[in-house]
């Protein structure tokens, strides 16, 4: 009997009969984290299609808390397998070309707590462990800096299965993700949309399937205020997985506070809806980000430019207007002529 079937049999049997399990089975590992983190010039939870300029770099350190991200149910019986979970993330990105940005993410599960799973024949979970590292490449397609109406980028990422299986921080195999992100101004606000697909190993808690892979469609939207002071953010995220009976939806609201032109703090929190594993009923995200970009390069004209020579301006001389010549008249010619008759 393969592990997923044995797991479901153990859970259902324990909930119905409530025996004391003597042989404990380790829960097959899968990645419980569902939050997509974005890098560079965008929000930490949603991409906006912008890229770092060549030579620019961005580093972020974030910590988050999740409440009830994994709950097993069987009728009225319930097992809070992961009631509380805290994790940290170190992420960085670098602008290579005007159309290419590379990034890396290193997550870590700091601690997690839940009900004792030995009642259903499961071994306890590890409280700490390394998460799934992610390597990412972002390709710029459109840019408002180039005079185009929107910012548009394509993200390609791969998650490496090197994390801790007992901490529910890795899949059985690598995960691949493709995502398109777009951003544009919307009056006094900055809006962004994203849509992507994730190919990952099938969740062992899902019903059995002939395929060991599962496809997941992820959508997101964000509205943010602009300015140099405190900026507000409102994000909506949704996921529709082939191995889940209902979608996963999260709403996050918060803000970003610049400390100086390169350093800023961010904080977001909000509820989650859905019974998909990894969807908490509440999530809190705090962190700090650092971004430094060189000034944009001067662009030089490639076409030949005719040479010019500076010369003193020659102003036309005004012609002198000479008064008409006055011819003297003898005085006697001015006197009245004598009348010869007198």
Give residue ranges: language-model regions:
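Transmembrane beta-barrel domains of Gram-negative outer membranes and organellar outer membranes
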Residues: 23-307
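Cleavable N-terminal export/targeting peptides
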Residues: 1-28, 295-342
